Design a protein with these regions (language model features):
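A general structural signal for well-ordered alpha-helical segments in protein cores
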Residues: 1-5, 128, 132-133, 159
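Rossmann-like dinucleotide-binding domain that binds NAD(P)(H)
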Residues: 1-55, 59-61, 75, 150-153
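Residues at helix-coil transition
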Residues: 10, 137-141, 164
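Generic structural signal for secondary-structure transition and capping sites
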Residues: 13-14, 44, 67, 144, ...
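Generic domain-boundary/flexible-linker signal
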Residues: 27, 58, 71-73, 80, ...
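C-terminal glycine/acidic-rich active-site capping loop/insertion
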Residues: 66-146, 172
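Conserved short C-terminal alpha-helix that flanks the catalytic cleft of nucleotide-sugar-dependent
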Residues: 156
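C-terminal capping/lid region of NAD(P)-dependent oxidoreductase domains
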Residues: 164-172
């Protein structure tokens, strides 16, 4: 659900590609997911959730046309650009060279923003406690929930779509 948080900003979003796999699982649970979500005139959302890469520095990675979010159970980090902060640059038609006339690789500086945070605890202690705190304050004081039933329904709809597109054979 973490990567699907972007889904709520795009009311006409739909799953345009999905792939589930059980590469390193002896049972019948998915351990890999690749999901592309698109909406008219919005950035493409590329979600990859994997527990099969032995060298990955993240469990979830969401790539968009303006930035990337990566996360582990311990922390998350986002790197992104803001429209208007990076001016258009003219096309350079001749070969790029350094001061000595040697060819160089083209690059340009981008004004990027980086945010991140470490999580204290895990989904089963801190996450569950925060959910129950929110439920308590919703019932007793009417405070809004961070995740509404409508948001949960949208995430469940995407999950159901992805599972319908990728039926797993029953092993047991």
């Amino acid at each position: 659900g973490m990567g699907l948080g972007f889904f709520f900003f795009f009311p006409n979003a739909r799953v345009v590609y999905s792939k589930l796999d059980t590469a390193l699982t002896s049972g019948d649970a998915d351990d890999y997911a690749k999901i592309l979500i698109a909406a008219p005139n919005k950035p493409l959302i590329d979600i990859e959730i994997s527990s099969i890469d032995a060298y990955s520095s993240y469990n979830i990675k969401v790539q968009g046309t303006k930035g990337t979010l990566k996360a582990t159970p311990a922390a998350y980090e986002m790197t992104y650009i803001v429209d208007g902060e990076n001016p258009d640059r003219p096309v350079i038609e001749e070969s790029l060279k350094d001061e000595g006339g040697n060819p160089i690789y083209c690059w340009e500086p981008l004004n990027k923003h980086v945010e991140g945070e470490s999580f204290n605890g895990n989904a089963f202690d801190v996450g569950t406690a925060k959910l129950y705190d929110q439920l308590y304050y919703k019932i007793t004081e009417g405070r809004p929930m961070t995740v509404t039933p409508e948001m949960a329904a949208a995430v469940i709809s995407v999950i159901e779509t992805v599972h319908a597109q990728n039926p797993l054979p029953l092993k047991y």
